[in-house]
UniProtKB/Swiss-Prot annotation:
Native organism: Influenza A virus (strain A/Udorn/307/1972 H3N2)
Cell compartments where the protein resides: Virion; Host nucleus
Family listed: Belongs to the influenza viruses nucleoprotein family.
Sequence motif Unconventional nuclear localization signal, residues: 1-18
GO BP annotations, alphabetical order: symbiont entry into host cell; viral penetration into host nucleus
GO molecular function, one term: RNA binding
PTM note: Late in virus-infected cells, may be cleaved from a 56-kDa protein to a 53-kDa protein by a cellular caspase. This cleavage might be a marker for the onset of apoptosis in infected cells or have a specific function in virus host interaction.
Designated name of the protein: Nucleoprotein
């Protein structure tokens, strides 16, 4: 677990590595990227896609989803045992878009899962290459985080829509492993735990018997993952209390909601990784670039450089704005759905707008949408500067018990002030006397009250020119202090559940 002194870098989590040095990590991440790229090239050949069609992000998503479904052991077993009409459990597929006579056509393809698994393993030197699969899951998760606001899911578990900046990774599948756990936000972990506790309340046998033992193990593991994200002793102590509860119930739910609220100021540490669509890695590998030999990192300049030199296209609906579609995908590629918009605008070099101001729906096209009116355009995924990713949460002082970035989960280690209205957040803590009163609660509230809005996070850290690969000359941006840059606030983005 992350906080027990076994800190592994994201890259190690990403590649299931034991402790490796930086060069080995860069090589093993590069190897993973090579595998995804080779697989994508092979799939484009199988599907007879032109170069342009192969760079279409919608085709990339279908191909990624096919391989993820082919390796989803649990769901495959479930489908075998519960056959449903018209679904062949051994096959996987989806929409592939091709350009025919100057028009975009949708073609539904179907493949044996066995065949897809064979192509994937072949592209990955015979391995299952779980790290590559997880990498694609995180890309899908980052895209969902940028596209949808999870208000309804928050309300359902008794949380507040204002906590949406804690929801990174809320659509990641359970099987996403250590790399997946690292990128999940505090709110996501709290929501998973609350759902579990609610099941226990409603189903008397949930914690009992042989199965209940496994369930209990999973519960404690999830508690430990969440505990590892908190950076203050009081928050961690509360997590111990939740984990050790004999019979988790409403008191634990209250504690978890309290902790989630506290994370709006006392930020948890949540990893950020730049995971790009397979249609970016494919052409790069095809052009002869050797990621394993050159080395690759998900948290440094590499993804920025790769995006600078990539051509990716997207289908555009009649009333969508291509520039807005580009922003959506750019944010997803940089795992920046919860980063401060002032900062993103600076890095990107063009204004980044809140979700509600974008005239664009999600990237995926539903099967009932009319293809006759579909156009396509180039996604502008380049940036003006690059910056190092962070997982610190942006807390300001070294005891790590101060104001983090309110309503924002920082993705980049770049200096910024914390423009926030603390009174609004503290109001959430008054008059809520449910749950336990404890020294820990008092201590957490005291730390939050001490948070000063005028403080600066990541002091002295800056962005870098793209030519500055060794990060030698940080450029510290200056921002308009008054204006808080949250992507989802005051907003009406579509819901993921729709």
């Amino acid at each position: 677990m992350a906080s027990q002194g076994t800190k592994r870098s994201y890259e190690q989590m990403e590649t299931d590595g034991e402790r490796q040095n930086a060069t080995e990590i860069r090589a093993s991440v590069g190897k993973m990227i090579d595998g995804i790229g080779r697989f994508y090239i092979q799939m484009c050949t199988e599907l007879k896609l032109s170069d342009y069609e192969g760079r279409l992000i919608q085709n990339s998503l279908t191909i990624e989803r096919m391989v993820l479904s082919a390796f989803d052991e649990r769901r495959n077993r479930y489908l075998e045992e519960h056959p449903s009409a018209g679904k062949d459990p051994k096959k996987t597929g989806g929409p592939i878009y091709k350009r025919v006579d100057g028009k975009w056509m949708r073609e539904l393809v179907l493949y044996d899962k066995e065949e897809i698994r064979r192509i994937w393993r072949q592209a990955n030197n015979g391995d299952d290459a779980t790290a590559g699969l997880t990498h694609m899951m995180i890309w899908h998760s980052n895209l969902n985080d940028t596209t949808y606001q999870r208000t309804r899911a928050l309300v359902r578990t008794g949380m507040d829509p204002r906590m949406c900046s804690l929801m990174q990774g809320s659509t990641l599948p359970r099987r996403s492993g250590a790399a997946g756990a690292a990128v999940k936000g505090v709110g996501t972990m709290v929501m998973e735990l609350i759902r579990m506790i609610k099941r226990g309340i409603n189903d008397r046998n949930f914690w009992r018997g042989e199965n209940g033992r496994k369930t209990r193990g999973a519960y404690e593991r999830m508690c430990n993952i969440l505990k590892g994200k908190f950076q203050t002793a009081a928050q961690r102590a509360m997590m111990d209390q939740v984990r050790e509860s004999r019979n988790p119930g409403n008191a634990e739910i209250e504690d978890l909601i309290f902790l989630a609220r506290s994370a709006l100021i006392l930020r948890g540490s949540v990893a950020h990784k730049s995971c790009l669509p397979a249609c970016v890695y494919g052409p790069a590998v095809a052009s002869g670039y050797d990621f394993e030999k050159e080395g690759y990192s998900l948290v440094g300049i590499d993804p920025f450089k790769l995006l600078q030199n990539s051509q990716v296209y997207s289908l555009i609906r009649p009333n969508e704005n291509p520039a807005h579609k580009s922003q959506l995908v750019w944010m997803a590629c940089n795992s920046a759905a919860f980063e401060d918009l002032r900062l993103l605008s600076f890095i990107r070099g063009t204004k980044v707008s809140p979700r509600g101001k974008l005239s664009t729906r999600g990237v995926q096209i539903a099967s009932n949408e009319n293809m006759d009116t579909m156009e396509s355009s180039t996604l502008e995924l380049r940036s003006r500067y690059w910056a190092i990713r962070t997982r610190s949460g942006g807390n300001t002082n070294q005891q790590r018990a101060s104001a983090g970035q309110i309503s924002v989960q920082p993705a980049f280690s770049v200096q910024r002030n914390l423009p926030f209205d603390k009174s609004t957040i503290m109001a959430a803590f008054t008059g809520n006397t449910e749950g336990r009163t404890s020294d820990m609660r008092a201590e957490i509230i005291r730390m939050m009250e001490g948070a000063k809005p005028e403080e600066v996070s990541f002091r002295g850290r800056g962005v870098f020119e793209l030519s500055d690969e060794k990060a030698t000359n940080p450029i510290v941006p200056s921002f308009d202090m008054s204006n808080e840059g949250s992507y989802f606030f005051g907003d009406n983005a579509e819901e993921y559940d729709n």
